Amino acid sequence: EFPALGYRLDYKGRSVVISGDTRPTKNMVKFAAGADVLIHEVHVGLDGSERGGVRPVRGAHHTSPREAGEIFAETKPKLAVYTHIVWGRKSEQDLIDLTRDTYSGPLVVGQEMMQIEIGDKVKVLK
């Protein structure tokens, strides 16, 4: 069993939650509830399906797009961001589409050096 570490940063009424490698857990939902931004890892199987071609140990410690969508839907961040993306041959749009099965809110796929401004509104500056 590997520990799953995540972080919640609260400052002047704003909050950011960053998951580590994790399967879906009640603790993630508990600590991410109401965050302005939830940055979460995601894993897509090597064949582009939810878990296809994934070694059991890897699949057991990551979250699928649909599972992440469920977490986003339950915690209701102003912006959901994917990071530490482990995926097969899918495009970013495919990743978003898989997530849309369970989450319809604001979602972006994180990029190197992406900047996010958190105020009354949350916006990606790039």
Question: Which residues are covered by each model-predicted region?
Answer:
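Cap/insert and terminal regions of metallo-dependent hydrolase folds
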Residues: G6, K12-S15, R23-M113
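Short hydrophobic beta-strand that contains or immediately precedes a catalytic carboxylate
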Residues: S19
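Beta-rich catalytic cores
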Residues: P3
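Binuclear metal-dependent phosphoesterase catalytic core
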Residues: V109-K126
